[in-house]
Amino acid sequence: MDSDPVSDYLKYENEPEYLDLEELPDSDEPVYILGKQYDTKTDKCDLQSDIVSRLWFTYRKKFSPIGGTGPSSDTGWGCMLRCGQMMLAQALVCQHLGRDWRWEKHKNHPEEYQQILQCFLDRKDCCYSIHQMAQMGVGEGKSIGEWFGPNTVAQVLKKLALFDEWNSLAVYVSMDNTVVVEDIKTMCKYQPQSCSMAQAASHQSTWSRCRDTSGHCSGWRPLLLVVPLRLGINHINPVYVDAFKACFKMPQSLGALGGKPNHAYYFIGFSGDEIIYLDPHTTQTFVDTEEAGTVQDQTYHCQKGPNSMKVLNLDPSVALGFFCKDENDFNNWCEVIEKEILKHQSLRMFELTPKHPPHWPPFIPPTKPEVTTTGAELIESTDKLFDVEEEFEILSV
């Protein structure tokens, strides 16, 4: 199809065209996208639909200044924050819409889809906005406008999720390359209630059985599991490659955060030795809700062929993401990880242990401190938030 490059660019800024996957040629190698397998010779339309349906968060400009006097664009520094938003958004899509949900332009979508989008708008009163993430990053030692690594973004999402009552996600970020099954089940089976910092300091947090909106005990909060890893010193150790790629085959896969130094991507799959990613390095204008309360969603879906890079060119600092909707889903994840991914490694990518290591400090599930606002509104200072648990966390990889 003949096209004018200038007009194509203008269309992309305002209303992207649905493009062919010319960048992904026919191959005997299957393509895996977040737990789904495709044949490029026969499944290109389905593959295209799957990739386009992922929520795509990029640099934005002309939003209200962060903190009132800070930057009004995240161009140049917010790429890892945007990748973290994409991973979390995929978890929320799986939770509310299901992995098989597909986006179509100009089609009415479920109300939950709009609710998910509104969690990530570039406004200070949206739970996972660039404003909230940047300001929560201050508590992780990152100045507003400073580049984040994958582990720092994971820690920020874990803390912001405590203010997100609609999704009620349990966010677990592994430490010391170890995933502790017992700790995850403790966190997912109980829902924290707001407590004072004095109570948290004395480990007297108030907990109650997780309940759904009807008041019945649901028994399990949906789990966002993030595993920060360093898969080498300066480059990825080839011994980890097969296990890393195998994680994208799992039905619980949320992909991975990573990329190159100061240049983050959201990895969603692979084909052969090529790893496929969504790229946040496009600056688009801030989008707000319309009068009807809906969000114009065209610019939140990447309607062009996917990007890819050689897996060995990936920076070794990454964070794998997984979503487990219920306890059976998590048990299945544990079984596959142990028997099919970690067991066959000469050097294990990370450890999965059933019990809390006795030499570790006691596991204290995170609770939301008392704040003067509701939800995630106006988290202006994080100096005193969560300082109790910080001593137990590894905050850099």
Curated annotation (Swiss-Prot):
Its EC number is 3.4.22.-. A motif (LIR) lies at residues 392-395. It is found in: Cytoplasm. It comes from the Eukaryota. It catalyses: [protein]-C-terminal L-amino acid-glycyl-phosphatidylethanolamide + H2O = [protein]-C-terminal L-amino acid-glycine + a 1,2-diacyl-sn-glycero-3-phosphoethanolamine. It is an enzyme of class 3 (hydrolase). GO terms for cellular component: cytoplasm. Keywords: Autophagy, Cytoplasm, Hydrolase, Lipid metabolism, Protease, Protein transport, Thiol protease, Transport, Ubl conjugation pathway. The active site is at 79 (nucleophile), 279, 281. InterPro entries: Papain-like_cys_pep_sf, Peptidase_C54, Peptidase_C54_cat. The keyword Cytoplasm applies. The LIR motif (LC3-interacting region) is required for the interaction with the ATG8 family proteins. Required for proteolytic activation and delipidation of ATG8 proteins. Belongs to the peptidase C54 family. This is Cysteine protease ATG4A. It comes from Xenopus laevis (African clawed frog). The lineage of its organism: Eukaryota, Metazoa, Chordata, Craniata, Vertebrata. The gene is atg4a.
